[in-house]
Amino acid sequence: MLGDGKEGTSTIPGFNQIQFEGFYRFIDQGLIEELSKFPKIEDIDHEIEFQLFMETYQLVEPLIKERDAVYESLTYSSELYVSAGLIWKTSRNMQEQRIFIGNIPLMNSLGTSIVNGIYRIVINQILQSPGIYYQSELDHNGISVYTGTIISDWGGRLELEIDKKARIWARVSRKQKISILVLSSAMGSNLREILENVCYPEIFLSFLTDKEKKKIGSKENAILEFYQQFSCVGGDPIFSESLCKELQKKFFHQRCELGRIGRRNINWRLNLNIPQNNIFLLPRDILAAADHLIGMKFGMGTLDDMNHLKNKRIRSVADLLQDQLGLALSRLENVVKGTISGAIRHKLIPTPQNLVTSTPLTTTYESFFGLHPLSQVLDRTNPLTQIVHGRKLSYLGPGGLTGRTANFRIRDIHPSHYGRICPIDTSEGINVGLIGSLSIHARIGDWGSLESPFYELFEKSKKARIRMLFLSPSQDEYFMIAAGNSLALNRGIQEEQAVPARYRQEFLTIAWEEVHLRSIFPFQYFSIGASLIPFIEHNDANRALMSSNMQRQAVPLSRSEKCIVGTGLERQVALDSGVPAIAEHEGKILYTDTEKIVFSGNGDTLSIPLIMYERSNKNTCMHQKPQVRRGKCIKKGQILADGAATVGGELALGKNILVAYMPWEGYNFEDAVLISECLVYGDIYTSFHIRKYEIQTHVTTQGPERITKEIPHLEGRLLRHLDKNGIVMLGSWVETGDILVGKLTPQVAKESSYAPEDRLLRAILGIQVSTSKETCLKLPIGGRGRVIDVRWVQKKGGSSYNPEIIRVYISQKREIKVGDKVAGRHGNKGIISKILPRQDMPYLQDGRPVDMVFNPLGVPSRMNVGQIFECSLGLAGSLLDRHYRIAPFDERYEQEASRKLVFSELYKASKQTANPWVFEPEYPGKSRIFDGRTGDPFEQPVIIGKPYILKLIHQVDDKIHGRSSGHYALVTQQPLRGRSKQGGQRVGEMEVWALEGFGVAHILQEMLTYKSDHIRARQEVLGTTIIGGTIPKPEDAPESFRLLVRELRSLALELNHFLVSEKNFQINRKEV
């Protein structure tokens, strides 16, 4: 992709690679590690022994294809087989069998898993790395208090702190702390060993009193003292085995298991050489940590930055899947133990096959993919969304932070993120800074650290081949890294001058000769979303963040179009998303249609099925269109069919349309957008959406539910689309209220509702007459469209627990309309306020009307000037029939490089097309345009151009909602909230202020009382409004006021009001 001939080339890694590598690591290493931990299981009499032979494990190829798993709502998984042996110790016989342990969901070519027919993805999590961290805080007297925190592999914490008298304590809970001597003795060290292994024995001896000596006189005493302090137990506990086990479980297992990474980190931080396989905290670690803490007190050593990436680790797909396998095998162990003891009790001869069940493993993985916070439904709005979702990094999840507790420091950008985590792409709202995105070239290293690549520069040897290094966050602190992008550095223009560089978390300017490493690619620091923004260096970071989020919300259009101005990454994003169909080897096309492409190659005939109107989980339409003709020869890797939002194998999320930046009668006030009717009639922004409606049939206590066309008491026109089975026919056009599936649920009627002849039959013959209630699937409001698919999924077994499911898929064609949201690639978003006839739109000097009018006031205050560059360059590109791919930070080549490029291209376009208005030197980039209604020119020249505009998934059809009557909340008796609950609007604070401002007291009182939550009065209001007349005044209070009174009563406050008589000033007390 980059680099010149002397250096070799550097290619961008596959965007799904991080998921593939994680899953491969689990299959290759994690599976064997967990199986090898499975213990030998013996019966009570030690006569039978069961064990697994993990060397011979086998994963079988899935029985179904990916597409069938999605269609039939099944899990795309592989069966795991392991050899197991049962040994009879008395006779020394062994029975070995190959047994089925369970199903493990597999990863497909998109880096996702299919569980119960749904695409799911596992997010990578960032956790605090296990190890020891030294920090200092100021106490209430302003004196520094030094602490050392030991974090275990499970996330448990053990704090060491040093007080004014230089005594060292281990804090075991928020309130309890114990002497470090007691802790070391409880872990197995005696006083002589403690004093031999520390650098400051005199400090340890200084706080050793006679009472303390007695406590640590023996290991048993130390354990009892530690247990008393840890569990806050009074009296004198007696030393026992159970007490040791409790302490082991509650304290040592949770807070002292360091794991492989924790052992490495503690060895490195405290200069120890304890073997890597020793994964538990030892007395030596505690004493070395205490020594280091004393050194900190005396001003030696450095404090740790908890937010530095070297102190974080990535919990990848491999770790999460391995944890789940360990959990499943521990459950399996309990099952095997129970089965062995049961077999011996009933005097049965067990076999390995009988002892093992596949349920623990299968259910553990299904519940993990279905319920774990880091396992999410894959967002498939468009191809970009699919890829970006798999590259997310989350601080949230089990063992991590929460949106409420995370402080500003954790959310902020850190210098160590440079080249590893994108400084721009994060979610908005409560999780800002907690969910990040991987930089393009970043990868996960062996120890769970994020690594970034750099080119190593050798002194005086410019001709030598330059080496590429992947550095972890702890390594790159020792190098001077040139911050300039590699394209500029390749040109040799930096060799004489100073360059910006990064060294030990600081950004400096140094001479070129002092540089050790340099970046390999201009986009190295950004994620995929941010790398698709052209001229990103001219935008404010907040707007770039919005843009990278909004590109993921773009709807695939019916006729997509490549962007004129791009960044060059569009092709790789499209290819890695798996949306286009690609030839796996060369051959010749034999046949193509909308459903498949058949081609011959290597002596075989291959058929590639194409995706036809597939629904994504955001209701967008995924569809493939063939791009090759019959008889054509193709090469390996060639695009055979374009998918949704791709054109020619490149990402195409929007359209290049003619835009003017000018005010127009106030219709683009506050970011509103004015558009031409051409965009509607020309199907420029038309998209297809597929909605799924489903219904289940159950077996009730009165009998099974029936799918039928014979539905009593319903109008015939509502049933007109049903076939003989009672299911809607393919290709039907359905409107709101139409029946999609006819269903009857049996129920027993009340005695009073029986007809006289029914009662007679029951009395004479004892026949139970049953009636049925219609529970049909009806098309809800806003669901009109064409039925494109009907699926009847019958689960195996067909019991009441496995109901039959009928799914109906309806396609909608949505043109752009008032209320839809559109956005550019620079965070410039807006809602469509008016659709103007084309003759009323402002038009250019060559007579072309513009397609869209944006508000120019949206640019200066938001500082996203990149849109102006893109707009003007897009106009030049459309006139010259050229496409531009621009790398960021081109100011590195020379000053004002972007502006010079845009102006030079506009000048070329004006000369080539003989249109002088395209580039006018008095106001370059602007042009005089005319009012379509009058034909008069506007006073000021206006910026016109062709930016790339996207239509977003926030569409008015999904948002608009009205309510005439509906449900009320039981407590407040006010309408429910939200479209999904058929809710209504509430007269809130601001509405009350508005009405107060106009002084309409009676209307306000009606709105707040009678019409809102007065149960009787609101029905009377409706009647009097229809008939005419005065609204009767209710005697009692509205429901929300009564609620207030009750809440006050719960606080023991009684609310009463008094009436004072004018005549004799007598107080008549009345209870509310």
Swiss-Prot record:
It catalyses: RNA(n) + a ribonucleoside 5'-triphosphate = RNA(n+1) + diphosphate. SUPFAM superfamilies: beta and beta-prime subunits of DNA dependent RNA-polymerase. The keyword Membrane does not apply. It comes from the Eukaryota. GO terms for cellular component: chloroplast; DNA-directed RNA polymerase complex; mitochondrion. Gene3D superfamilies: 2.40.50.100, 2.40.50.150, 3.90.1100.10, DNA-directed RNA polymerase, beta subunit, external 1 domain, DNA-directed RNA polymerase, subunit 2, domain 6, RNA polymerase alpha subunit dimerisation domain, RNA polymerase Rpb2, domain 2. InterPro entries: DNA-dir_RNA_pol_bsu_ext_1_sf, DNA-dir_RNA_pol_su2, DNA-dir_RNAP_su2_dom, DNA-dir_RNAP_su2_hyb_sf, RNA_pol_bsu_bac, RNA_pol_bsu_CS, RNA_pol_Rpb2_2, RNA_pol_Rpb2_2_sf. It is an enzyme of class 2 (transferase). Its EC number is 2.7.7.6. One of its GO terms (molecular function) is DNA binding. Keywords: Chloroplast, DNA-directed RNA polymerase, Nucleotidyltransferase, Plastid, Transcription, Transferase. CDD domains: RNA_pol_B_RPB2. It is found in: Plastid, Chloroplast. Pfam families: RNA_pol_Rpb2_2, RNA_pol_Rpb2_3, RNA_pol_Rpb2_6, RNA_pol_Rpb2_7. GO terms for biological process: DNA-templated transcription. In plastids the minimal PEP RNA polymerase catalytic core is composed of four subunits: alpha, beta, beta', and beta''. When a (nuclear-encoded) sigma factor is associated with the core the holoenzyme is formed, which can initiate transcription. Belongs to the RNA polymerase beta chain family. PANTHER family: DNA-DIRECTED RNA POLYMERASE I SUBUNIT 2 (PTHR20856). DNA-dependent RNA polymerase catalyzes the transcription of DNA into RNA using the four ribonucleoside triphosphates as substrates. This is DNA-directed RNA polymerase subunit beta. It comes from Nasturtium officinale (Watercress).
